[in-house]
């Protein structure tokens, strides 16, 4: 059973997300939070497989919340839900430690697919976020090293860092470094020694 924490400041949204997950046999809403601070307190006290986070809550939220949760529970996966489809939001969320990014206009089925995929170690982007990243990155991908491009291709295919490392004969740390470089435009294309 995949234990999910839902963090959204709108009760009606949390209730809708709970209804969607109630229709599955492998996803369980283990807790819900109405703020980023509440989510952080819950994560400190409990273990969850995936945290679903609203990008735009008042107070602690967005990229800072992702970073704080990642620092607290590095193995917990995070799916960011947002009304923003622009590539900057998705890229920053992934760089901060999220494993997935969905716009709130995504279909229910895509939410369930995303949760399962990232719980298994993969990465998931909504169609809108992926399209925006591709459009923004049409020339950006050309600045990636061959190895970074290969890591990106496998991330998009849904593989997690461990699987990518095994496939490319790299350590998980090296894969994570490549992932950081891919989603940080200032570092894209700069190769570490020996890569």
Predicted regions and their residues:
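Short, flexible helix-to-coil linker/hinge segments that flank and couple to helix-turn-helix
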Residues: 88-95, 99-152, 191-194
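The short loop immediately C-terminal to the conserved phospho-acceptor aspartate in CheY-like receiver
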Residues: 49-51, 55-56, 77
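Helix-turn-helix DNA-binding segment
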Residues: 134-180
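Active-site residues of response regulator receiver
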Residues: 8, 54, 82
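Short amphipathic alpha-helix used as the core "switch/output" element in two-component signaling
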Residues: 41, 63-75
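Acidic, metal-coordinating helix/loop segments flanking the phosphotransfer/catalytic sites
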Residues: 32-50
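Acidic catalytic/metal-coordinating carboxylates
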Residues: 35-38, 58-64
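Basic, Lys/Arg-enriched C-terminal extension of HTH/homeodomain DNA-binding domains
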Residues: 39, 180-195
């Amino acid at each position: 059973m995949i234990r999910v924490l839902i963090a959204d400041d709108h009760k009606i949204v949390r209730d809708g997300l709970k209804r969607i997950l109630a229709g599955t046999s492998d996803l369980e809403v283990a807790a819900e939070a109405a703020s980023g601070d509440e989510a952080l307190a819950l994560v400190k006290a409990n273990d969850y497989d995936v945290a679903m986070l609203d990008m735009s809550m008042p107070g602690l939220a967005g990229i800072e919340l992702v970073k704080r949760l990642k620092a607290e529970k590095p193995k917990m996966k995070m799916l960011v839900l947002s009304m923003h489809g622009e590539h900057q939001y998705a890229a920053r969320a992934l760089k901060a430690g999220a494993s997935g990014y969905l716009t709130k206009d995504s279909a229910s089925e895509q939410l369930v697919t995303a949760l399962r995929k990232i719980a298994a170690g993969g990465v998931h982007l909504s169609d809108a976020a992926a399209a925006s990243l591709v459009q923004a990155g049409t020339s950006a991908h050309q600045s990636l090293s061959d190895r970074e491009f290969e890591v990106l291709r496998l991330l998009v295919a849904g593989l997690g860092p461990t699987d990518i490392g095994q496939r490319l004969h790299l350590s998980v740390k090296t894969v994570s470094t490549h992932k950081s470089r891919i989603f940080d435009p200032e570092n894209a294309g700069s190769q570490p020694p020996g890569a």
